[in-house]
């Protein structure tokens, strides 16, 4: 089979070896089976899950570094974005990527933090009803020590970091705070 376009969603969470079959796919006459790829993702959100440390996944070969492959934990999306944005001053590279600026998932209060911390204030709320609703405190919790936190969409509760010998996937202190 041959496809004009392959759309890869959440591409920042997919490592290159996982895409290799698609990237190298050939049709019966030996031509590319996929005409072009569209990678959709957000390099400022969750990366691919890799259990190796930064040093274990580091690329040392100069020939691979010359194509922007510095760490095996980076997705193809991240590598291509880094390469193109490094040459952003060129008019031809500006057409390779864009940013969706309207979001319809998060409540406006929740979106405020990532909008300013990661997106330079470029995100706009679509204005859907669920983005504007107020939080109501459940009956019986009016005197709870965390009542003000429970009606806030965003709060910071400091936690104790886990010791390096424990799994990076578990933080008992954070679990206790949220339970």
Predicted regions, residues:
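Conserved helicase motor core of SF1/SF2 NTP-dependent helicases
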Residues: 1-179
